[in-house]
Every structure is written in C-alpha cells, then in structure tokens.
Amino acid sequence: MKKFLALLLTLALLAGLTACKATEAASTAQEQHTVTAPTNDATFVYQPDDPAATLPGGESVVLVTGPGGTESGEDAMLWQGIQTFANTYGYTADAQTAAGNTADEAEAALRAAAESGAKLVVCRGDTMGAALYRMQENYPDVHYLLFDSEPHSDDYSAYNTASLVHCVLFQEEQAGYLAGYAAVTDGYTTLGFIGAREIPGIVRYCTGFLQGAEAAAELQGEYVTLQTWFTDTYENNDAITQRMIDWYNNGTSLIMVSGGNLYEGVSGAVNQTGGKAITTDYDNTELGDRVLGSAIKCYNAAVQRQLYTFFAAGTWNGQTGGQTEKAGFTNGEVALVAGAPWRFDSFTQDNYRTLYEDLRTSVLKMDAYSDLDTLPETPNVTVNRLL
C-alpha cells in the first residue's frame, strides 16, 4: 500500500512539473508572437510563424494602379511590398498602369494583367472595385487581391465578391485614434480635421481622431475643441489652403487632413503660420518637421502577409476567397509614424508602444463610426462641424 501511495505521489509531482513546463512554453510562444507597434511601414519584411517553411515560387504577381503609377502614395507602398515578397520567396513582380481614372480604363488594365499570365493581380480603390465587379469571373485561373474597396456596381447599388477575390479594408478609426491621443498628450487642445469628402473611410479617420483625443483629454483633465470640414474635392486649391491658414491664425494648433492631396495644402499652411499637422493613409513626414506624423495604413506589411497567405495555400481558400478582411491593430497594419527622430515631445515612443498594445489587446476600447450624425459621447471634446 505504501509503495502504491508513493507511486501516486510521484506521478502527481511529475504531472505538476509537466503542467508548469507546458504553461511556460505557452507563455513563451505567446511572447514570441506579440505584435510590435509599427513605426515605419517602409522597412517591414514579413516573417512567417514557421521560419523553416518554404513557398514554391515561380509565379507572377501583377500590381494594377491608376495613372499615377507606383512612384508615390499608397500604390508605391503596395509595390514595395510586392517586390519585397517576390525577392524573398522567388516570385516575379510586375506592374500595369491604367491609362486614366475611369472604371473602363481600370478594367482594361486589369484584363491586360490577367492575360499576362499572372497568378495573382493586386489592385486598390473604388475605381478598381467597380472594374473588378464586371470581370472578376472572366479568368478562372487568375486570382485578385483588392485593397480599400469591394467589387461593386458603378452606382454602388450592388456588391458581389467572387471566390477568386479577397478584399482588405483597413480600420481607419484605429489609426485616427493613435493620432488624436498623441496630439492631445502633446498639449494640442484646439484641433481641426479637414477631409476631402464625407465618405465612410475618411469619416472613420475623423471619429477615431475624436475618440483618441477624448481618451487623452480625460486622462489629463483637459478640455479640447475639434472643428471639422469636408472640402468636397480631392484636389487641393488656393481657397482650401487659405482656409487652413485662417484656422491656424484664429487659434487652431493642429490640423489632421485626410484624402487626395490635401497634404500639399496643409504643408504650405503650417510653413506660413507655424501650426502643426498630421496626415493620413501613408507617410508624409518628409514634408517637414511641422508635419508631426502620419496616421497610416501599412500597405507594405499588409500586402506581404496577404501574398504569403495566398501562395502558401496556392489559392484563396474557403476562409479568404469571396471574403473581406479588416486590417488593423491585430496584425500591426495601422500605425502612427512620426519621423526620425520622433517628433512628438510628451507622447514618447514608449507611450506609443504601450497605447498600441492596450488597443490591440482591447484593454482600451474604441468603436468604428462611419458618419458624423452618430458620434460617441465626448464630454472632454467639443465638436464644431463647419460647412
């Protein structure tokens, strides 16, 4: 009997030790997979969970862009990501440029890419979404990766995503939150937001900016004002720049701009007045030190991850084909970039990393609001909508 009890005790001790080791291993694995708060999308190189895994290589990936090509902006970051992936894993990268900004011209470029022998065609934006809606099932051996849109009819009355297509929509409100929190933490309490059009993606930047500003203001016991205006055009002009200048001269300390080339206007306005600005979508900090940062979508990181997912399976599978994915904190695909050296003072890089992790793990909560008629309560931020 004593021997039997001793055996049971020994087994219990061994089980306890094994459980401890398993817990330690799980904890270590979790630490290894923690997402690091991104500060520069341009330097990202995708690292798979299994570094020993290999891809077959040899296939072609084609990026189709608007007439602006791959020289700057969002398409430049997508192109960088595609090239990085192709060079790392042995694929071929190519690009097609649409002749103009219409859906017909986008469709012609998409068809040329499909007929070039591409395994996967990458594109971005609503014009490409309208073009893809028409022809997404015409080439059964070609797959598509669409950013910032979903296949839709020209009048947006109908949507349909074929099984050959995977869509990625970024959570702009998350990037906006980072910017609003940083601005108020750094002492900017008279804020502005100027958007090109009052459409869901741009509005989400604004409402995220508002929620971040509210969180920081509440923490610091500050009261903040935020005035908003939508220009109804993606093209900056002298009148828009002058309105920015007037805002700064009348006490606005920092303006966030979103859409089109409004960043050109705010760059001129801050240089004339000494005000500060934050831009969106991609890194514009090269415009000067008065552009404190950019609330960005990490196109480079996102496209590399999507390409790896696609080529690892050889297709869009049941979880990806015909589906739309929302990219954001979870995979480190939105960010606040703030130059080198870091341009915020009170809001340090350590503060940024802590904030990012708290948002990623839902320690801090935020919501997506796609219109300005339904806003969260913000007792510390007064919103003034201008026409």
Residue ranges and their predicted role:
Residues M1-L9:
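Positively charged n-region of N-terminal signal peptides that target proteins for export
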Residues L7, E24-A25:
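Extreme N-terminal leader/targeting regions
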Residues A22, A29-L387:
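A residue-level marker of the well-folded mature domains of exported/periplasmic proteins
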Residues A15-A19:
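C-terminal motif of bacterial Sec signal peptides marking the signal peptidase cleavage site
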